[in-house]
Amino acid sequence: MANYRSLLQILLSNGAVFGDFGSHMITTTEALADAVQAAQAAGAVGIDTEFVWDRTYYPTLGLVQIGYPDGHCELIDAPAIEDWSPFATLMADPNTVKILHDAQQDLTILKRACGAYPKNIFDTQRSCGFVGLSSTISLSELLKTLMKVRLDK
């Protein structure tokens, strides 16, 4: 458990989750390509999605959040993006770690959006099961347990 705690502390140490960080809304394929280039240069990014499941067989992607190790965050306005091929490049890149919590739904909808199978995924929820914590733990509970931080959702 000590190694996992260390990893989580590294991921959270710069205020990316709790501090004051800059964000930028991405609404074009060109801006998405720039964000992907920054993600690849960083070597690791946190990814989360927001989607709507209303009167459809599949969920509709609404927002993709990308967090960088320096604390910066990109918000991708999914309906505004016409060409997801830059994001497909990121998802398929084996040299960039994609960090998600409870990744299954996120990965399913991202695969539908960009068409790429993800490589080099780190799922914080699944990892908990390997270190003696619940493999179904919420992100809020995980942060409370390991970091003694209360996350308002």
Language-model-derived ranges and their functions:
Residues 11, 18-22, 65-153:
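Active-site-proximal helix-loop-helix substrate-binding element of RNase H-like nuclease domains
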Residues 42, 60-61, 95-96:
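Short, surface-exposed beta-edge/turn micro-motifs
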Residues 3-45, 49:
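N-terminal accessory regions of nucleic-acid-interacting proteins
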Residues 34-36, 54, 86-89:
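Short, flexible, glycine/charge-rich loop motifs used to bind or transfer phosphoryl groups or to couple energy/partner
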Residues 50-69:
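An N-terminal structural lobe/cap that precedes and organizes the functional/catalytic core
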